[in-house]
Amino acid sequence: MIDRLIDEEAVRTSPIHFGLVMTELGSLRSVQCPIEDIPEGQLKDYMLASSACFPALRPREIDGVKYIDGGWRDNMPLDLAAKMGAAELLGVDVDGIGIVRPNTTGLPTRIVRSHWDLGPTLDFDPARAGRNIALGYFDTLRLFGRCGGTAYAMLPDNEEFLARFAEQYQKLLAEVCARAPEIDLVEKNARQRANYPAPYAPNPSAPTRGALAPLELAAEHVGVPEDMPYTPKLLAATFMGSFDKDPADRFPALLDGRDNTLVAERAIAAAVPEEFVTALVSKTLGELPIL
């Protein structure tokens, strides 16, 4: 496949300066290789060595020396990019095997990270690869301010649906906290455990990542697909169509004031805060016009 896809001459003459990192197997020494240091005719060998994820893949031997994946010693070679003349850096952290070295370049740096589990390093399933490519695209758009959200790619909210959702969500949350004051901490804990931003500030109804967080968290919890963009209203509608039994039915005492099961529901909410937030989001959306 590499013979079919890689044109060495095109790489060498490209205005985009190419480089790679390998790890010398015997010494575990990191070897940085800008394109001009790679001998003519050997680029494909160097690329195979740089991606030889040992021990699953065999080392690649070059001039009598065995090399493995450069990520073992330097999984985000920002230093190499700086040495090659970069004025600012864009790194991609796939949370893979290997060492991510501290960024000591002093250059302006942005790092693309995914909220989602990207799967095993050696999972080459085409469907997963397509999903991860889409997620990487959305994560990059988000980093450069072209879309919003934390987990989902959120498009502009031209209908101000998010503001209405946030206002109603905060109203219902305050009512629940009046029945069970610890629920405020439960809601914050759900965000923290699922890597979502803290609650709203300074305006509870402002269309911020914090305001989106409960809706995104609930959508993730019920399995709303993550590899497509959404407006807040579309995400809400997709969430509401993703279950047969309403999550809000699990917390009638907390959400509707039926005291007969309040103690048990408080315990459940504390144990699985994501379940409670999902229920509260469902209750909120049930009181808003979506379609």
Regions picked out by a protein language model, each given a short descriptive name:
Residues M1-L291:
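Patatin-like phospholipase
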